[in-house]
UniProtKB/Swiss-Prot annotation:
Signaling molecule that serves as a cell density signal for both genetic competence development and sporulation. Secreted during production, but the mature peptide acts intracellularly, indicating that it needs to be imported into the cell to function. At low concentrations, CSF stimulates expression of the genes controlled by ComA, a transcriptional factor that regulates the development of genetic competence. It includes the srfA operon, which encodes a small protein, ComS, required for competence development, and the surfactin biosynthetic enzymes. It holds the Pfam family PhrC_PhrF. Changing E36A: Does not stimulate expression of the srfA operon. No change in inhibitory activity. Strong decrease in sporulation stimulation. Loss of activity toward RapB. Does not acquire any ability to inhibit RapA. Induction: Part of the rapC-phrC operon, which is controlled by the P1 promoter. Transcription from the P1 promoter is activated by high cell density through the phosphorylated form of ComA. PhrC is part of an autoregulatory loop, and it positively regulates its own expression. In addition, transcription of phrC is also regulated by a P2 promoter, which directs transcription of phrC only and is controlled by the sigma-H factor. This is Competence and sporulation stimulating factor. It comes from the Bacteria. Interacts with RapC and inhibits its interaction with ComA. It comes from Bacillus subtilis (strain 168).
């Protein structure tokens, strides 16, 4: 059980890092789309 929860936390951290990397890589494009859509 402990190993599974640890693995889950690691997966969450990896996903967060991957998302942050993608956001920073496409920051300008994302910012433009968000502004265009009026943050809906």
């Amino acid at each position: 059980m402990k190993l599974k929860s640890k693995l889950f936390v690691i997966c969450l951290a990896a996903a967060a890092i991957f998302t942050a990397a993608g956001v920073s890589a496409n920051a300008e494009a994302l910012d433009f789309h968000v502004t265009e859509r009026g943050m809906t």
